Swiss-Prot record:
Described function: Component of the serine palmitoyltransferase multisubunit enzyme (SPT) that catalyzes the initial and rate-limiting step in sphingolipid biosynthesis by condensing L-serine and activated acyl-CoA (most commonly palmitoyl-CoA) to form long-chain bases. The SPT complex is composed of SPTLC1, SPTLC2 or SPTLC3 and SPTSSA or SPTSSB. Within this complex, the heterodimer consisting of SPTLC1 and SPTLC2/SPTLC3 forms the catalytic core. Within the SPT complex, SPTSSA stimulates the catalytic activity and plays a role in substrate specificity, which depends upon the overall complex composition.
Species whose genome carries this gene: Salmo salar (Atlantic salmon)
Protein localization: Endoplasmic reticulum membrane
Entry protein name: Serine palmitoyltransferase small subunit A
Annotated site residues (Within the serine palmitoyltransferase (SPT) complex, defines the length of the acyl chain-binding pocket, determining the acyl-CoA substrate preference) in this chain: M25
Predominant localisation class: endoplasmic reticulum
Family matches, as InterPro entries: Ser_palmitoyltrfase_ssu-like, SPT_small_subunit
Membrane topology, from the record: Multi-pass membrane protein
Lineage, uppermost ranks: Eukaryota, Metazoa, Chordata, Craniata, Vertebrata
Amino acid sequence: MAFEDVWKKISWLYYQYILVTALYMLEPWERAIFNSILISVAGMAVYTGYVFMPQHIMAILQYFEMVQ
């Protein structure tokens, strides 16, 4: 029963994603390309944040003399 509820929620969220981004008008192969590009850009943004955020935080803390 819980699995069905989770599946319904995921299906509902996917349906909302399709409607909000207007992907329902695209062919399946076009939708796959769009989703691939979106996942790639999101992955690069997360990776860049993971790599560079600590350096920026340390620079800010040193600027405000909170860390020596």
